[in-house]
Amino acid sequence: MDGVIVYCLNALVKHGEEINHIKNDFMIKPCCERVCEKVKNVHIGGQSKNNTVIADLPYLDNAVSDVCKSIYKKNVSRISRFANLIKIDDDDKTPTGVYNYFKPKDAIPVIISIGKDKDVCELLISSDKACACIKLNLYKVAILPMDVSFFTKGNASLIILLFDFSIDAAPLLRSVTDNNVIISRHQRLHDELPSSNWFKFYISIKSDYCSILYMVVDGSMMYAIADNRTHAIISKNILDNTTINDECRCCYSEPQIRILDRDEMLNGSSCYMNRHCIMMNLPDVGEFGSSMLGKYEPDMIKIALSVAGNLIRNRDYIPGRRGYSYYVYGIASR
């Protein structure tokens, strides 16, 4: 069958943190309900276990888009930020589980094998015109043609993502003022700086065995580990994704940015430099001691730090999710 391509995950995705997220985090994700109907319409038969999970994978998405553009000469993008997570346990090696992609029409399925070292399965792919069989070892990525179904043989855990043809993404910004702070999970926000008087920032908050705040503010990097009290506040309900809607535009039309008030962000936190590190304080959250590489710009740091506090207090659909962490890209005036 033409159009079936298999990649090694490490060769396809050039981002170590996202690769580790795919390999290690998906099995702990809770199920989500507010999901595009096209994802729900992926029919799963047999005795397979199925879960619908958030799959914010921007680097994988870009890599798949590049591959598909070379084949179809068109842009592709994710239909939904969610994915089907499937556990197949087929010890007798007989075909099991029908995954039918005739709903939705014109979808390009991308299948990632995760799980254990010994896991391996075969995909028996079928369309109206042809059939094919491919072997999918651990951490392999299969990009399938449109409008196909497939059976499986063997044992594996699979992530199924759906792509379709798309035009270029619409701009995130329409009108802004110098008193706006804009955040989004989409990195392309950084390409829409209104002027050179604005700066970019990136925030990642991870809370597993400890809570880590990582910020890049106008090129300066900060890395902070929370104390036990602050960690307890940040880690509470870290995996609660029940309030998150999809952004598919056919079932859900959530805004892709949030606009915050610059003055509120500037006054919502504090920081000061001591001999060894930057001390940063978030009211009602806690204090962080952060290392720093780059120039110390207190106003910019306070704006980004207050955005981090906003994320901790308000865990909705705006930030991207990556296992036990979440992240945003942001811009603000200097």
Swiss-Prot record:
Keywords: Early protein. Induction: Expressed in the early phase of the viral replicative cycle. InterPro entries: Poxvirus_A51 (IPR007032). Belongs to the orthopoxvirus OPG181 family. This is Protein OPG181. It comes from Monkeypox virus.
